[in-house]
Amino acid sequence: MKAIISLLLISAMVFSMIEAVPVXXGLQLFESERGCLPHNRFCNALSGPRCCSRLKCKELSIWDSRCLG
């Protein structure tokens, strides 16, 4: 019984921490994880085939990539 109560308390704490993060901050975290740079103009080599504004990314070199329309 104590284990069940402890599990419920832990899950409530985790849920409250998740809900405490605003949606806008969550989106910013997601975009930064993709490696997008400011103003949706550039993306780095680790961002994959998409940029923040859903434009395609053309690699100019390993370190410099430009988002295309």
Swiss-Prot record:
Residues 21-34 form a propeptide. Residues 1-20 form the signal peptide. The modification Leucine amide is found at residue 68. Keywords: Amidation, Disulfide bond, Knottin, Neurotoxin, Secreted, Signal, Toxin. Expressed by the venom gland. Its main location: secreted. The keyword Signal applies. GO terms for cellular component: extracellular region. GO terms for molecular function: toxin activity. Disulfide bonds join 36-52, 43-57, 51-67. The presence of a 'disulfide through disulfide knot' structurally defines this protein as a knottin. Insect active toxin causing rapid but reversible paralysis in crickets. No activity shown in mammals. Does not show effect on mammalian voltage-gated calcium channels. This is U2-agatoxin-Ao1i. It comes from Agelena orientalis.
